[in-house]
Regions:
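Cysteine endopeptidase catalytic domains of the caspase/legumain-like
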Residues: 2-300, 310-327, 368
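Short, charge-rich amphipathic alpha-helical segments embedded
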Residues: 317-336, 362-376
Length: 376
């Protein structure tokens, strides 16, 4: 028979621990993840941090309740098979599934199309890339066709182009992707802005993955707020050289971790986004009023977190001095160029590429635009 004092001790312990929040995966949905880390490239120097990033992300996602499939150093055939096997796993998990893909390695854009780079890619000319690589759109379309609750794609894939045969023929970084044009319930994150290159980092992990590993561990943090903080953290770590970017068509909230008190909020509908039909000038004016009178550093971090053209335009009008003014103007110019490029690629006619060249006659996309303008 248990002694009364022991019973009292047990009751006290239960009461004490009942008031301590329990950290766990944020909801009861099924969670599956595919983590690809491409380090051992055969035709170009290795990317050691990509493998490190993938291993650390697999650990994080496992602790967040994901059933993780790790797939390192994939050839083209292996990558396609891994995506196919993952799609089957997602489908078998049912419609209440969060499917997440993390990719670390090289990425390329050819003619406005983004490609994930297998370790056996060895192009002799630009035309070899579509034959030897894996289209990002193929991954997105495969996930988009599955009846899932949510699709999350994280790409630490915008490192410099290391292939000599492609020097001067491809655009920098990756092309802009708009999730609103595909399946709803999709979130895609780039490690840097469209048309920009990401850093591999001086430590064991890239600046992007370092920030992801730190920020997402905070309990009850909605995914879109998490990636705003990740953007600011990476921007600070790289002194403005790298700014992560994301596109979202999510219709429900998602949190990597939650306490018991955050469970109900984890499944609540997302608040309505700002009306996209509001004129750009009006959005700029709202940001102008928001930033007015703020210290440059505070205003800079606000617009970096928002990462919208309207926010950058308002900042550029108010703050001209270094270091923040030139950074934002450069970022704004490149963002406008990448939006114009995405529009030209979507229309895909000679007049569309001619219009792009009229605004952007020089730069890393000009050669491809000239080819597009010359098409019959």
């Amino acid at each position: 028979m248990r002694h009364p004092a022991c019973n009292l001790l047990l009751l006290t312990a239960l009461l004490l621990f009942s008031h301590i929040p329990l950290l766990h995966a944020a909801s009861s949905e099924s969670r599956v993840a595919l983590v690809i880390g491409q380090s051992a490239y055969r035709a170009v120097p290795a990317l050691p941090n990509a493998g490190n990033d993938a291993r650390r992300m697999a650990e994080l996602l496992g602790s967040a309740g994901f059933a993780v499939t790790s797939a390192p150093d994939l050839s083209q055939n292996d990558m396609r098979q891994a995506i196919s096997d993952f799609a089957a796993k997602v489908s078998a998990s049912g419609p209440d599934t969060v499917a997440l893909v993390f990719y670390a390695g090289h990425g390329l854009q050819i003619d406005g199309e983004n490609y994930l780079v297998p370790v056996d890619l060895d192009p002799k000319r630009e035309a070899d890339v579509p034959l030897q690589a894996v289209r990002l759109n193929d991954l997105m379309n495969t996930l988009g066709a599955l009846p899932t609750k949510m699709r999350i794609v994280m790409l630490d894939a915008c490192r410099n182009n290391p292939f000599p045969a492609l020097s001067g023929t491809t655009g920098h970084g990756l092309a802009l992707v708009d999730t609103k044009a595909g399946a709803s319930g999709t979130f895609i994150s780039y490690s840097t802005s469209p048309g920009a290159e990401a850093e591999d980092g001086n430590g064991d992990d890239s600046p992007y993955t370092t920030a992801v590993l730190s920020v997402t561990k905070e309990p009850n943090l909605p995914i879109e707020e998490a990636f705003k903080r990740i953007r600011v953290a990476v921007n600070q770590a790289t002194e403005g050289r790298q700014i992560p970017w994301e596109s979202s068509s999510l219709t429900a909230d998602f949190k990597f971790f939650a306490t018991d008190s955050g469970q109900q909020a984890a499944t609540a509908p997302k608040p309505a986004e700002p009306n996209p039909l509001v004129p750009e000038a009006q959005r700029v004016e709202v940001w102008h009023r928001t930033l007015q009178g703020k210290e440059p550093k505070v205003a800079y971090e606000l617009v970096i977190a928002d990462d919208s053209v309207a926010a950058y335009e308002a900042f550029a009008a108010l703050y001209s001095q270094a270091p923040y003014g030139p950074r934002v103007r450069s970022l704004l110019e490149r963002r406008r160029e990448m939006i114009a490029w995405a529009d030209a690629v979507a229309v895909n006619t000679a007049p569309a590429f001619a219009a792009f060249l009229a605004s952007y006659p020089i730069g890393d996309l000009a050669a491809t635009a000239h080819d597009g303008r010359a098409r019959p």
